[in-house]
């Protein structure tokens, strides 16, 4: 099992009251036993101590944690019998039959990454929080099957227009919009991308 940027608390509201979570926490997700946790950058909604403690502190299992420098330093504070891997841009990791590769992202954190995951014959690209930046495309292969891209347009993330341009340039077969509905009331149906799949909160999607 792979978990990416888990945020299952209301930690951010303590810093900014406007960023209260609009969706309740599904506590069943706190009981997941991940093999790999990926944190794409060092912001509280991506490296959340209140969430990570369930996966790293309250377990005797060994978990692989992949994170760029600043996020890695935060996650590593949990200690335990875990493998904390500093996963900066152009890093790679193989866990079983799953391959991970980190790529450039453009965000307000100093060390953000996107992640490409190759599993079961498909390539999944998680952009992480990012703005549109031409340099990113140097890292992206031309055979992405599924891409996950932010659309909220605040906090140094792409808006829907830029996310559509970005998706078209990547050329992924399927595009999943993310970073909506948690701190805002965005309607993902306003994301005008023909090959999009809109997920429902806490529901499995087949991509």
Report the location of each language-model feature.
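A short helix->loop->beta-strand "cap" motif at the edges of active sites that frequently abuts
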Residues: 58-64, 170-174
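Binuclear metal-ion centers of metallo-dependent hydrolases, dominated by the metallo-beta-lactamase
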Residues: 79-93, 138, 143, 162-207
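Metallo-beta-lactamase
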Residues: 34-46, 60, 66-121, 175, 195-207
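Active-site-proximal loop/helix segments of hydrolase catalytic cores
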Residues: 50, 106-169
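Structural motif
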Residues: 2, 35-36, 98, 122-124, ...
């Amino acid at each position: 099992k792979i978990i990416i940027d888990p945020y299952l608390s209301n930690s951010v509201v303590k810093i900014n009251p406007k960023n209260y979570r609009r969706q309740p926490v599904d506590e069943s997700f706190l009981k997941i036993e991940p093999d790999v946790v990926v944190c794409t950058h060092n912001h509280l909604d991506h490296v959340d101590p209140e969430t990570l403690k369930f996966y790293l502190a309250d377990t005797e299992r060994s978990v692989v944690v992949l994170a760029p420098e600043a996020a890695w330093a935060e996650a590593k504070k949990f200690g335990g019998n875990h493998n904390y891997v500093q996963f900066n841009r152009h890093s790679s990791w193989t866990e079983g039959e799953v391959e991970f590769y980190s790529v450039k992202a453009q965000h307000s954190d100093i060390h953000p990454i996107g992640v490409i995951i190759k599993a079961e014959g498909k390539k999944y690209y998680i952009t992480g929080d990012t703005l549109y930046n031409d340099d990113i495309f140097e890292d992206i292969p031309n055979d992405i099957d599924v891409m996950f891209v932010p659309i909220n347009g605040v906090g140094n993330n792409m808006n829907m227009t830029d996310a559509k341009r970005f998706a078209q340039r990547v050329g992924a077969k399927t595009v999943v919009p993310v970073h909506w509905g948690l701190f805002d009331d965005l309607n993902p149906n306003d994301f005008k991308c023909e090959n999009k799949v809109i997920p429902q909160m806490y529901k499995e999607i087949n991509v």
